[in-house]
């Protein structure tokens, strides 16, 4: 990893998820000579919409989680470190290693972290579904339950948003009747933000796979073998996956930034309110009056828009406002099944599954990686 030739003139991007990585790659295409620094502590980018296919071994690790040193070429300096403090006035960043960096433009795209709502036992006795460690843990649970085939064993998924619904469908297919799968949701319906078509198809898929859906149910405590509900009843489990919420993961910033609904408030061009050269994207940002969904497609589009905005600033022009283009929603409903709406399509079943996966594979960062992955998938048909 090399340092940019002039750190004080660099574009520094904090966070290598969808927003950060796509900003870096798009900016390099627009301004090949621009010094770009990407700060990300992990060694792999994670394409989370395809994490379900990694759980079922339908895709391989290199396809879903490519290494940053394979995605980034010599035009982008990757620093594998963690930001501990950002000083806006003097435009410096302090890293966990003790190093300091200056910037000309700053992009914050640090994503989110799980929200346990302070419920006892969630951190100690549950798994999330956000990274490769979580995938490995769930694979171990599934293998163990498959070998035991204990009729009293069961998995509980808490939270019936997209992650919870997709995960419950996938695990029900993989466990193949060796244990029960239960989806617990505090609200009165699954997928409250989805289209009616996707919600209905998901409900039908859950029923077909034997997933028990328990609505209007809140968890008050989690132990190694039980989930205690708010009404006092107890559910036994052999593994509990928590997908019930997230919080923005915002680094320490001085002076304190303006917040909107607990996120960094941004103007129409994604610059932080009160700043001329600092941007915030994805799950950590919010535009007053414009509730963008917390999704990969928003972060990817914001990455492209931020790259264009920075390119404009560096030649003395004002950025254009960000315009989100809703391209619809695609949901995995288990092995070989999916539902999607958007771009003029309303589709469910095996064809939707193939279209969803092909669409995501071609969106993998780095053209060669996307083509390799799509080619590998086509050869497996």
Protein language model features and the residues they cover:
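Beta1-alpha1 glycine-rich phosphate/pyrophosphate-binding loop at the start
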Residues: 2-77, 156, 165-194
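FAD-binding core/adjacent interface of flavoenzyme oxidoreductases
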Residues: 1-9, 76-154, 241
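An active-site-proximal "capping" alpha-helix that borders the catalytic cofactor pocket
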Residues: 36, 295-315, 330
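FAD-site-proximal beta/loop scaffold in flavoenzymes
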Residues: 124-151, 234-301, 308
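A Rossmann-like FAD-binding core segment of flavoenzymes
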Residues: 76-86, 173-268, 319
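C-terminal, flexible cofactor-proximal segment of oxidoreductases
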Residues: 6, 308-381
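Glycine-rich, N-terminal phosphate-binding loop of Rossmann-like dinucleotide-binding domains
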Residues: 16, 110-111, 117, 231, ...
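A short alpha-helix-loop-beta-strand transition element characteristic
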Residues: 80, 146-151, 180, 315-326
